[in-house]
């Protein structure tokens, strides 16, 4: 069986694929293995899905290779764009279902999940528009040569996506890869496979030929490792932790030196100057850390506030965080649902305990909410020092630290005091301060008087240990193309 009927409070009953999507069909795994998908809201088993093993990865890669070397390689850019737009239209048509499935196995609030799907639609349409605009150039060197440079697809792309934004990452990865003419084998996160499989069911309906987009469910140490080290995969793209990113980079290097892009962890500073609109800043700082349950690689988990407004800010921020509704992801007023899994829940609670043990002050939160499901109260630590684990390490949950700074130079130094460099934010009414601090911060994205406002037209990625390459925007096309130089001799003689 490769599908099962499920039901959500938002979408009603629907058919949930559970197989591996290879060659436009849902199939069972070669070894017949399945694994449980857990509902993080109540800790129950939602269903089982088929687990991809190394044998299944081989089959999926072979399907992608056959498609790439066959008719897909000759497909016109215009038609690739049409197919991506068809897929975007189907996402839009099925927005309620896709959002509900996200909330079911990820636990995110349904209002946030709908926002994710809208962003998927925008992303797929954006890259659909790019498909026929990827151009080369002619370079003049000497009168007797004609030289041109063209962009070609890389080939078979392995893509490994995380559990925090399952469908959004699905679109971020597939959009540019397909626009550039590649084929794809995408592995969903084992915690959240359901949305990616429902999305895969739309691929055939959109008109894609068999083998162009393949979606498999499985574990990182098995299917992810097989993709990363596969000798017939030309490119691997990964979003997730820095620890796993290093493993993937090593696997790529020790196999066929496949190209790699990595979007990894973060410990992003959110800096509030004394001249900022304090109420506006508090709203964005709250959103910056507690959005998506704090499960964002770019979460603003290190808050730095200028000392003259520090006490006032802490009090107001605490009051704002306490208003965040934590609970059933399908309730209309819920802002924060459960953490994605017991493993993640336990990890976050360990960090909270470490903060307490180190002497930090819990301004609010610091506890589990309820006794069922992986819910954690929004947590703010004050009286922190830069050497504390909760300040240095990525927690990936609804936990932030808040500290004082005196001068602009102090803020910059504190902001850059991390091995990560994914994102940062500056809150100020002074344009000179905004520009100077933004330029000085070692981060791939800096927001000013806002936070988490990503857009598919804007490149996103990190400095330092936060990754290699950029997602989104025109920059992402470079992840999925290679450059070919052609030089044609026009004269007859070898020299002269």
Curated annotation (Swiss-Prot):
Q: What is a single molecular function from GO for this protein?
A: aldehyde dehydrogenase (NAD+) activity
Q: Which PROSITE patterns match?
A: ALDEHYDE_DEHYDR_CYS, ALDEHYDE_DEHYDR_GLU
Kindly indicate whether the keyword NAD belongs to this entry. yes
- Report which superkingdom the organism of origin falls in: Eukaryota
Q: Which transformation does this protein catalyse, written as a reaction? A: an aldehyde + NAD(+) + H2O = a carboxylate + NADH + 2 H(+)
Q: Which UniProt keywords apply?
A: Allergen, Cytoplasm, NAD, Oxidoreductase
Q: Where is the active site?
A: 263, 296
List, alphabetically, the GO terms of the cellular component aspect: cytoplasm
Pfam families named among the record's database cross-references: Aldedh
Location of this chain's protein in the cell: Cytoplasm
Query: In its keyword annotation, does this UniProt entry include NAD?
Result: yes
Q: What is its EC number?
A: 1.2.1.3
Q: What is its main location?
A: cytoplasm
The record's InterPro entries line, in alphabetical order, gives: Ald_DH/histidinol_DH (IPR016161), Ald_DH_C (IPR016163), Ald_DH_CS_CYS (IPR016160), Ald_DH_CS_GLU (IPR029510), Ald_DH_N (IPR016162), Aldehyde_DH_dom (IPR015590)
Class of this enzyme: oxidoreductase
Using the record, list the residue span of the signal peptide; answer none if the entry has no such feature.
none
Q: Which family does this protein fall into?
A: Belongs to the aldehyde dehydrogenase family.
The protein, known as: Aldehyde dehydrogenase
Q: Which organism was this protein described from?
A: Davidiella tassiana (Mycosphaerella tassiana)
Q: Which gene encodes it?
A: CLAH10
């Amino acid at each position: 069986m490769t599908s099962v009927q499920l039901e959500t409070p938002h979408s009603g009953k629907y058919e949930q694929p559970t197989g591996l999507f290879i060659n436009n069909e849902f199939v069972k795994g070669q070894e017949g293995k399945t694994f449980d998908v857990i509902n993080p809201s109540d800790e129950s088993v939602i269903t089982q899905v088929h687990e991809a093993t190394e044998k299944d990865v081989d089959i999926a890669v072979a399907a992608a290779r056959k498609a790439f070397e066959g008719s897909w390689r000759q497909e016109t850019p215009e038609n690739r764009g049409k197919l991506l737009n068809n897929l975007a239209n189907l996402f839009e048509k099925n927005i309620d279902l896709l959002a509900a499935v996200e909330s079911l196995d990820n636990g995110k609030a349904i209002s946030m999940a709908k926002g994710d799907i809208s962003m998927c639609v925008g992303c797929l349409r954006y890259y659909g528009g790019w498909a026929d605009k990827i151009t080369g150039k002619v370079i003049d060197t000497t009168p007797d040569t004609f030289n041109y440079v063209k962009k070609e697809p890389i080939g078979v792309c392995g893509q490994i996506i995380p559990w925090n934004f399952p469908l959004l990452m699905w679109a971020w990865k597939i959009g540019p890869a397909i626009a550039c003419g590649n084929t794809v084998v995408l592995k969903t996160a084992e915690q959240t496979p359901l949305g990616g499989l429902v999305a895969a069911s739309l691929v055939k309906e959109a008109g894609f030929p068999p083998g162009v987009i393949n979606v498999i469910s499985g574990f990182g140490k098995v299917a992810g490792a097989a993709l990363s080290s596969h000798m017939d995969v030309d490119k691997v793209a990964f979003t997730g932790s820095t620890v796993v990113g290093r493993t993937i980079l090593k696997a790529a290097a020790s196999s066929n030196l496949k190209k790699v892009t990595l979007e990894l962890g973060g410990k992003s500073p959110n800096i509030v100057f004394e001249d900022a609109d304090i109420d506006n800043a508090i709203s964005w700082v709250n959103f910056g850390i507690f959005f998506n349950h704090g499960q964002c690689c770019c979460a603003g988990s290190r808050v730095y506030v200028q000392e003259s407004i520090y006490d006032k800010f802490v009090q107001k921020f605490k009051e704002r965080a306490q208003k965040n509704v934590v609970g059933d992801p399908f309730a209309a007023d819920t802002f924060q649902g459960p953490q994605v899994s017991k493993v993640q829940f336990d990890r976050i609670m360990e960090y909270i305990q470490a903060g307490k043990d180190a002497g930090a002050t819990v301004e609010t939160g610091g506890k589990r909410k309820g006794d069922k499901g992986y819910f954690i109260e929004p947590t703010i630590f004050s009286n922190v020092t830069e050497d504390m684990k909760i300040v240095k390490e990525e927690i990936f949950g609804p936990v932030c630290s808040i500290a004082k700074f005196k001068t602009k130079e102090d803020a910059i130094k504190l902001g850059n005091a991390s091995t990560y460099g994914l994102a940062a934010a500056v809150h100020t009414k002074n344009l000179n301060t905004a520009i100077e601090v933004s330029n000085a911060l070692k981060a791939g994205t800096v927001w000013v008087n806002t936070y988490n406002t990503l857009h598919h037209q804007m490149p996103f990625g990190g400095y330092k240990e936060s990754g290699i390459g950029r997602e989104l925007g025109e920059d992402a096309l470079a992840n999925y193309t290679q450059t070919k130089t052609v030089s044609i001799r026009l004269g007859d003689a070898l020299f002269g």
